[in-house]
Amino acid sequence: MTAASQISMSARHLGYTRGGPDVPVESLKITNELLQKNHDELHIFFRDMNGHNHLVHNLFTRLALGATPEQLRTAFNDDLPTQRGIPSLDQDVVDKMHDDDFFSERITKINHYNNFMVFFEKEIASKGWQTVVNQYIFSKSRVAEALLPLMYDGAYHPIIHLGLGVEFEQPAVIAEALAQAAAHDSFDTDWFFQSAEQGALESQSGASPSSSESTLLELARETAQDNTIRDAARTPGLIGTMKMKKAIYPKAGKQLLSLASRFRVTKETLKQKTAEMVNFCAYLAGCAQRRDRATKVDFFFMHCVTSSLCLSVLAQQPWIDIADRVRLIEWKGRLDLAWYVTCGVPDLDLDHVKTYQAGVERGWDDIFALVSDQHDDGHVAKFVRALKHGEDICQQFEDGDASKAFPIRGDMWQVIARMAYDSTLNLPPPAKWVIMAGMDQAWVSVPEK
C-alpha cells in the first residue's frame, strides 16, 4: 500500500465552500474510514452503463457542509446496498500499462477499472499527483487526448470525481477519477469537443459577424429558436447521454456545433467565463419549470450545476497550464449547451425562481444543516454546495458590462437550493428529479399545482 492508495482527510483540506469553520475530529475519522472501505472494496460503477458510485462525492460534500459522524455513516449506509465489489486485479496488465498502445487498447473497458486505478496509484506514488494529472489529462499525448473527453462523459461524473480529489487533495481519489475516465463508455464527447474547437478556429480565421463570440445565455436562446435543433431535442424514447449520442449529434450536430463553437474563453477572460458558466448552469436548473406542475429540478441540469464547482476548482489550479484551464471551461460551457438540447430545450423563465415560495426564510447554514440530515445519495448536497460557490464567485459580475450574462443573483442562489431540497425531501430516488425537462412526458408523474 502506498500513500496514493490511502484516504487521509485533514482539517487543512476541507474544500472551497464549507458550512462552518470547525469540523469535528470524529467526522474526519469516520470519513477516512468509510472512503478507505469504498476505495479498497467497491467498484466505481455500480452497473456497467452510467452506474456511477457517488459515495466519495456524498461524503466529501457532507463533511464540508458540517455533517456529524452519525450523518456521514448514515449517508454511506443509505447508498451502500446499490454498490458492487471492485473488479479483480491483474498485475500483469498493470505492469504493461506504461506502453501507450497497450493502455489505449483498454480505454473504455470497464473490467479494467481496478487495473487502471492501481496503475495510476503507482504513477502518483512515483511522480506526484499534479504531474500525473498533467501527463494523462493535459499533455495532449494520444492517451491524454482520449482521456480528457471521457472526463466529461456520463453527465460529468469522472471530472466531478477529479475535481473533488483535487479540491480535497486526496491522491487516492484522483487515482479513482483517472481510472473512472479510462474505463468509461464514450458517448462521442471527443467528436463534439474536437469539432467545436475546429469550428471556433475556422470562424476566427475568416469570419462573418454571426460567428462572433457569444454568452451562454445568448447561445441557449438561439439554440431554442433553431428548428432542426428543436426537432432533434424532442426525439422520444431516449434519455441522457444515449439521446445525445444517438439523436442530438446525428440529427442536429452541425447546427449545435455552429452555436457551441461561439462560446470562447481566453486567459484574460477565464475568471469571468468560469463564473458565467456556473451562473448559466444554475439558470438552467432553476428556470426549467412548468407553470401547471410542482417545482422540480432537472436531473441532468443538476449535474451541470454540481460539476460547475469542480470545473471552477480546476480552473484555479496554478499547476495546470492556463491554456489547459481555458480549454476545460470552453468544453464545459459547450457541453452544457448540448445538455440543454438533450433535455428537450425547455422554456427558461426566471420568474419561476423570483416567485418561488420556500416557506420559512433560512440562510445558507440552515440549508446546509437540512441537506446534511437528508436521506439522499449526495445529489442534493452537491447541488446546494455548488450553488453557494456560484453565489461567491458570481457576485462581482452582477453589475457592469458583463451583467446580462449573470441572471442568477442575490438571494436567487438560496432560492434554487431550497427548490431542490423542498422538491426531493422524503421522496424515493425516481421521484426526486424530473428527467429531461423539455419533454412533456417528463412531467406526467409530477403533481399538479
Swiss-Prot record:
Q: In which pathway does it act?
A: Secondary metabolite biosynthesis
Protein name, as recorded: Baeyer-Villiger oxidase GME11358
**In the record, what terms sit under GO molecular function?**
oxidoreductase activity
Stated role: Baeyer-Villiger oxidase; part of the gene cluster that mediates the biosynthesis of dibenzodioxocinones such as pestalotiollide B, a novel class of inhibitors against cholesterol ester transfer protein (CEPT). The biosynthesis initiates from condensation of acetate and malonate units catalyzed by the non-reducing PKS pks8/GME11356. Pks8/GME11356 lacks a thioesterase (TE) domain, which is important to the cyclizing of the third ring of atrochrysone carboxylic acid, and the esterase GME11355 might play the role of TE and catalyzes the cyclization reaction of the C ring.
The similarity annotation says:
Belongs to the questin oxidase family.
Entry's induction text = The expression of the dibenzodioxocinones biosynthesis cluster is positively regulated by the transcription factor dibT.
Does ATP-binding count among this protein's keywords?
Answer: no
Matching Pfam families: Questin_oxidase
Q: Which UniProt keywords apply?
A: Oxidoreductase
- Give the EC number(s) under which this enzyme is classified: 1.-.-.-
| Record flagged with keyword DNA damage | no
Species of provenance: Pestalotiopsis microspora
